[in-house]
Amino acid sequence: TIMLDAGHGGEDPGAVFQGRQEKDDNLKLTLAVGEKLQDNGVDVLYTRTEDVYQTPFEKAQIANEAKPDYFISFHRNSSPDANQYAGAEVLVYDKSGIKYEMAQNILGALGEAGFDELGVKERPGLVVLRRTKMPAILVEAGFLNTEGDNEIFDNNFNMIVDGIANAILGTLDMETVEEEPMYYRVQVGAFRSRENADKLLYELLDQDYPAFLLHDNGLYRVQV
């Protein structure tokens, strides 16, 4: 399970530039990445799906109560002067563990989508990184007050979403491989009909097999 957080919200717009508000970009990106992860079978939770205000402490508390495996917060950066800086960066509490791997993978994906890569940086003072009890990262998807970064964000939006989602999925796959090196699944049936797939699934579960259902390319696949 992954919890996604759209930074800011409600009365807190985050960065603002020429009528553009960071909170809106954050939510758009968060929901799009979440949908892509869900399409790939990941359980996704959100701190917010609407334009509501939460303090960083509340966001961390929501995560700690939900107990996801990872917490990823999406933001846009800003600089004192317009068009002063450009690029994407990913922030972590410290450079250790799976969160650091995921942060590097996401940064690489943002680079491929057109942003300058400003690096993975330690920010132990940030509440959503310090107060969360699970691996947590904060993504800064370009500078909101830099026109070139906004062009990348708008024109390459789907590439950004796909890249971030694939970076997350790739990191999860890596972790699974590391944890379960000798783990194989066997497909026992593929059906066009959900009803037939469910029937086999329940029969296997009744016999205590760890069976589950996948859906892809119009087929329901039962695996153990």
List the predicted regions and their residue ranges:
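Active-site-proximal helix/loop segments of hydrolytic enzymes
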Residues: 20, 24-180
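A short acidic, helix-capping loop that chelates divalent metal ions and anchors anionic groups
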Residues: 12-14, 147-148, 221
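Short, small-residue-rich loop/turn micro-motifs
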Residues: 6-8, 75-78, 140-143, 190, ...
